Structure formats: C-alpha cells, structure tokens
Amino acid sequence: MRIALGIEYNGTNYFGWQRQREVKSVQEELEKALSVVANHPVEVQCAGRTDAGVHGTGQVVHFDTNVSRKMVAWTMGANANMPSDIAVRWAVEVNDDFHARFSATARRYRYIIFNHALRPGILNSGVSHYHGELDEKKMHEAGQYLLGENDFSSFRAAHCQSLSPCRNMMHLNVTRHGDYIVIDIKANAFVHHMVRNITGSLIKVGRGEEKPEWIKSLLEAKDRKLAGATAKAEGLYLVDVDYPEEFGLPRVPIGPLFLPDNLN
C-alpha cells in the first residue's frame, strides 16, 4: 500500500529536509513518527528537498507500508509523535505508480520580505528582513524576463548536482502587502538555490542598483558570478506541488498563514 502525505514545517531548527548523520532534519523526524504509527521502519520520498532554514506548507511525500490504518491514524498519529514545528496536513492512499518527486509536474515557492526600517520581533525566522526601500513593481517587471524555458546557470548554486540548468518558469509575480513583499514563483522544477539567487538579483533591481532589463542580460550571460547574492533562507517557503488530477491528491490553502492562493 502506498500513502501520500501533505507536510507543513518550520525549517528554522533543521539542517534541511534530507536525512543526515548527526544533525536534525525534517525527513528524519517525519520517518520516526510514521514508523511508530506503522510499527515498522518507514522511509519517505519527497517532492523537493529544501535547504537548512527553508520552510514548507506544501511539501508532498509518499511511503509504502504493509499495514492497514485509517487515514486519520497517519495524520493524527504522526503529529502526536513529531515536534510541534512539523505537521501532517493530509493523508490519502495512492496507486503504486505515484511518486512524490517523479510524478510532480510543477513546484511553487513563495519568498516573503519584511520591508521595513526595523526588524520584526514576531515571525523573525519566517520572513527575510530588508530595511531599505524596494520598488516591487520594478522587481515584478524584471521577473517577467525569466518566464518560459531558459538556461538558469546564472541563478544556479556552484555545487548544484542537476544534470541540466534548463527549467520552464511558469509564473513569477512580485506583490506588496503593506510592509511585506511576496515573490511567488512556479516552475516545472528548480536548480539548487534558484529561488534565493533570483530573489537576490530582484532585490538589486528593487533598490535601484540595476534596471529590470539587467535580469535578461544575466540569463544570457549564464554566469553565476554576475548575479546578485543568494537571499537568506528564512523567507522561503515551498508552498505547492502540482500533480496530474488522476492521482486525486487534496487541494488545501497554500499560505503561508493568511496569504491567499492568488495574490494578483
């Protein structure tokens, strides 16, 4: 039997999603909790591995088990055995051909910037703070140069293990909500640090150091050294993963918190 789960987590206290020796990971905590419910060792596969400090509201995983449990046992049981900063949002039985990573058709991230002169006290690890003025309209304009199928070498981490730097960017929207700026990005997949490197470059445009057209020149240059600095992990959320409707996965609000699904 194959089970799919929707996972939400605050990544602040973890060294990323992936299980690692001698450090805390979201995957390890989830697997330990599921193993208690299943009464056998459980290993999960995820839609996307997030880095240290990165959060998730829409992570999807799957695992196989030979025990019969009601779906509420996987949600309530796992949550009862996990730290309070990780939660299972839903559980469904899926066909054996479903794979959390390889069945996914798109991933969506949101990066939240608190744009204010003073740092926040609440949500300080859930947003990235930038004290200077940012022009979100110019940031949005710049982001439109990234749409479509492109080589994202200029926004790819030096140690990225992906075989190809090419990805299909489906949308990139930058909107302001009071003192908060939200960068909403969706693509078929992402190279390592792609969202944070794009964000760092958009910030340079937003503060007037570069014109929106500069983003186009970065794409063409295919040189990471020319782009902006990697933005901090704190403001980044994996909020949604798309799958073919045939798998019947639940649709839930993507957030984080009170943010609506559509910010336009």
Curated annotation (Swiss-Prot):
- Where is the catalytic site? D51
UniProt record, GO biological process = tRNA pseudouridine synthesis
Binding, substrate: Y109
Q: What is its EC number?
A: 5.4.99.12
CDD domains hit by this protein? PseudoU_synth_EcTruA (cd02570)
Which reactions does this protein catalyse? uridine(38/39/40) in tRNA = pseudouridine(38/39/40) in tRNA
One family name in Pfam for this protein: PseudoU_synth_1
Provide the alphabetized UniProt keywords. Answer: Isomerase, tRNA processing
Q: Which InterPro entries match?
A: PsdUridine_synth_cat_dom_sf (IPR020103), PsdUridine_synth_TruA (IPR001406), PsdUridine_synth_TruA_a/b_dom (IPR020097), PsdUridine_synth_TruA_C (IPR020095), TruA/RsuA/RluB/E/F_N (IPR020094)
- Which top EC class is given? isomerase
Q: Which GO terms describe its molecular function?
A: RNA binding; tRNA pseudouridine(38-40) synthase activity
Per its UniProt record, what HAMAP family does this chain match? TruA
Q: Which family does it belong to?
A: Belongs to the tRNA pseudouridine synthase TruA family.
Chain's role: Formation of pseudouridine at positions 38, 39 and 40 in the anticodon stem and loop of transfer RNAs.
The record's note on quaternary structure and interaction partners says: Homodimer.
Q: What is this protein called?
A: tRNA pseudouridine synthase A
**Which organism was this protein described from?**
Vibrio campbellii (strain ATCC BAA-1116)
Gene name as annotated = truA
